[in-house]
Each structure stands twice: as C-alpha cells, then as structure tokens.
Amino acid sequence: MQSFLSVWLVKHGIIHRSLGFDYQGIETLQIKPEDWHSVAVILYVYGYNYLRSQCAYDVAPGGLLASVYHLTRIEYGVTRIEYGAYQPEEVCIKVFASRKNSRIPSVFWIWKSADFQERESYDMLGISYDNHPRLKRILMPESWIGWPLRKDYVAPHFYEIQDAH
C-alpha cells in the first residue's frame, strides 16, 4: 500500500523508500541526504507548506543518525472532511546520515520553523545541517564537548558551573 504522495513521487522519478504507515495512517518516507533538499522543495511546491516538527535520534550505538520531519499540507479555503473533521494531508520524512559524516541539507530556507529545531538536533546529536544560517549550540554551552543524545556519549564526571551574567 502506498499513499497518494508516494505514488506521485514515483510517477515523477523521485527516488524514495516507504517505511510504512503509523497508527494514524501517515506514511513515513526515507530520503537520501543528497536528495533531501530537492525533495523538500518539491514537497513545498506540492503544497506541504507547514513543518509541524523536526527532531533527530541516534538509531543505534555506532550506527546511523536520523533527522525526522513531520510535514503538513494545509489548503486554505479548502475543506476536506473525514470522520466529521478537517483532515490535512501529512507525511513523515526520515533522512539518515552516517555518524562519521553526519551532514544533511538544511530546510531553513524552505520552512523557517526549522531554525531552532535543526539547531537543537545539531546541539544534541551533532548532525550538521548544510547552509543553515546560524548553526551553533542552542541548549549546551559553546564549550561543551560531545553530543549528549548519542548512544555512545560518555557523560563527564564533572560539570563546570558557569555564571550567567
């Protein structure tokens, strides 16, 4: 089973892999890092005008890192009713990157709401988002060593308390 979007992407020669559907019927697609920027532009033009959320996680110790995007297609002035309520079209995109070369194109210039979310993913997991205008730590001090949410992260035994002036 494929969603309308997945069929449309295949029809237009856009390589992706379906990872299935969640409990709400939202399809998850895997996109290669080198294809992500062009696919993101296509999705925006297709009508996915709202980045609901972006997050990242460490798949396994020593394994891949994943950047996850939840996109919504909101059509203003158009009402699609399912089960008595408006149902916008949604898709989940997963972009996997290797731990040694964890670079993924930023979608900041497509969806401005990716700004802080991509920065948090960088800060916690070390995923570098190419062409992000302000890619720097957002939660941890700039002097922090390592990426705290990686499964192979070794927590330091001592934390220096810094004065907030």
From Swiss-Prot:
Q: Which domain of life is it from?
A: Eukaryota
Q: Does the keyword Zinc-finger belong to this entry?
A: no
Which cysteines are disulphide-bonded?
A: none
Which InterPro entries does this entry report, sorted A to Z? NADH_DH_suC, NADH_quin_OxRdtase_su_C/D-like, NADH_UbQ_OxRdtase_30kDa_su, NADH_UbQ_OxRdtase_CS
Question: According to its UniProt record, where is this protein located?
Answer: Plastid, Chloroplast thylakoid membrane
Q: Does the keyword Chloroplast apply?
A: yes
A Gene Ontology biological process in which this protein takes part is:
photosynthesis, light reaction
Membrane-related topology note:
Peripheral membrane protein
The record's Gene3D superfamilies line, in alphabetical order, gives:
NADH:ubiquinone oxidoreductase, 30kDa subunit (3.30.460.80)
* Reactions it catalyzes: a plastoquinone + NADH + (n+1) H(+)(in) = a plastoquinol + NAD(+) + n H(+)(out); a plastoquinone + NADPH + (n+1) H(+)(in) = a plastoquinol + NADP(+) + n H(+)(out)
The EC designation for this entry is 7.1.1.-
What do the Gene Ontology cellular component annotations say?
Answer: chloroplast thylakoid membrane
Molecular function terms in GO for this entry? NADH dehydrogenase (ubiquinone) activity; quinone binding
Q: Which UniProt keywords apply?
A: Chloroplast, Membrane, NAD, NADP, Plastid, Plastoquinone, Quinone, Thylakoid, Translocase, Transport
- Summary of subunit composition and partner proteins: NDH is composed of at least 16 different subunits, 5 of which are encoded in the nucleus.
Q: Which NCBIfam families match?
A: PRK12494.1
Into which family does the record put it?
A: Belongs to the complex I 30 kDa subunit family.
Q: What does this protein do?
A: NDH shuttles electrons from NAD(P)H:plastoquinone, via FMN and iron-sulfur (Fe-S) centers, to quinones in the photosynthetic chain and possibly in a chloroplast respiratory chain. The immediate electron acceptor for the enzyme in this species is believed to be plastoquinone. Couples the redox reaction to proton translocation, and thus conserves the redox energy in a proton gradient.
Q: What is this protein called?
A: NAD(P)H-quinone oxidoreductase subunit J, chloroplastic
Q: Which organism is it from?
A: Ipomoea purpurea (Common morning glory)
